[in-house]
Amino acid sequence: MAGLAPEGSQFDARQYDAKMTELLGTEQEEFFTSYDEVYDSFDAMGLQENLLRGIYAYGFEKPSAIQQRGIVPFCKGLDVIQQAQSGTGKTATFCSGVLQQLDYSLVECQALVLAPTRELAQQIEKVMRALGDYLGVKVHACVGGTSVREDQRILQSGVHVVVGTPGRVFDMLRRQSLRPDHIKMFVLDEADEMLSRGFKDQIYDIFQLLPPKIQVGVFSATMPPEALEITRKFMNQPVRILVKRDDVTLEGIKQFYVNVDKEEWKLETLCDLYETLAITQSVIFVNTRRKVDWLTDKMRSRDHTVSATHGDMDQNTRDIIMREFRSGSSRVLITTDLLARGIDVQQVSLVINYD
């Protein structure tokens, strides 16, 4: 459990950073963890029966590597740092830990989860609700672009878990619509992305409004200095789990690398792929919003039907585009990596990292 600690008193960030550097440079180890217990099945984790029902109903059969190591320490109330790439099962890890610890007879917010984007927050809400379907969990997403009054109404009626973006969550706390008195779990998902988007001050402001003894989970693809600073200030002897990037591969997914000597040849190669392969739906990742617009125009000029979404678009437009893509009426989506962290579309058969 963590309170706001004096800098450097709770967590040796330099030791952690040095160990990560050492691990990333070796081929002998796949994981660095300060928690030795590994559970090969969900049944062995001591989870509530109705939580297990939700996990299996959602489609999970066997825990991923990070779930084998990360669910139980979170369920025990320990502070946890988990560093791994998207797609490794981090979301289900902290959702399971939260759902295991809730007091369902108390309809008050007991867990607060922050995410960098509206799309990701809504995706987490969906997973939390699905895994907790047999537990009767009440979850609400507090995100920008939605009605403040509706947020206030739902929060005042009572929820167990709030998932949201830092700006809207802080606003709800400031308005006293979100009462922090019973919050015992605080999760930062995609912490590196939140910090890169300038949410550091809001995260600190939110933490100051929470009870002094609170469990903290930090989940991130990378651990930049700003994220390590958060671990020092907020966390108490956290369990640390790092999965090497090279070891993050998902079963059933084939990965290919196309060596293109010149930047201008990428477009030709991309169009060749779409003319050669039978693709159900696909997502193309690019690094910038400007690149989204450029690639969309280029592909449309070559008679490819594509949709595009990025952070400069208004929220209603983004919602419409995502609904069309999920329904299958749009087959190709061009987007930035950050927005893509909230995308979950079962029919996608091809993912292209353009940059």
From Swiss-Prot:
One of its GO terms (cellular component) is cytoplasmic stress granule. Its EC number is 3.6.4.13. Residues 71-241 form the Helicase ATP-binding domain. Residues 252-355 form the Helicase C-terminal domain. Keywords: ATP-binding, Helicase, Hydrolase, Initiation factor, Nucleotide-binding, Protein biosynthesis, RNA-binding. InterPro entries: DEAD/DEAH_box_helicase_dom, Helicase_ATP-bd, Helicase_C-like, P-loop_NTPase, RNA-helicase_DEAD-box_CS, RNA_helicase_DEAD_Q_motif. eIF4F is a multi-subunit complex, the composition of which varies with external and internal environmental conditions. It is composed of at least EIF4A, EIF4E and EIF4G. ATP-dependent RNA helicase which is a subunit of the eIF4F complex involved in cap recognition and is required for mRNA binding to ribosome. In the current model of translation initiation, eIF4A unwinds RNA secondary structures in the 5'-UTR of mRNAs which is necessary to allow efficient binding of the small ribosomal subunit, and subsequent scanning for the initiator codon. This is Eukaryotic initiation factor 4A-13. The lineage of its organism: Eukaryota, Viridiplantae, Streptophyta, Embryophyta, Tracheophyta.
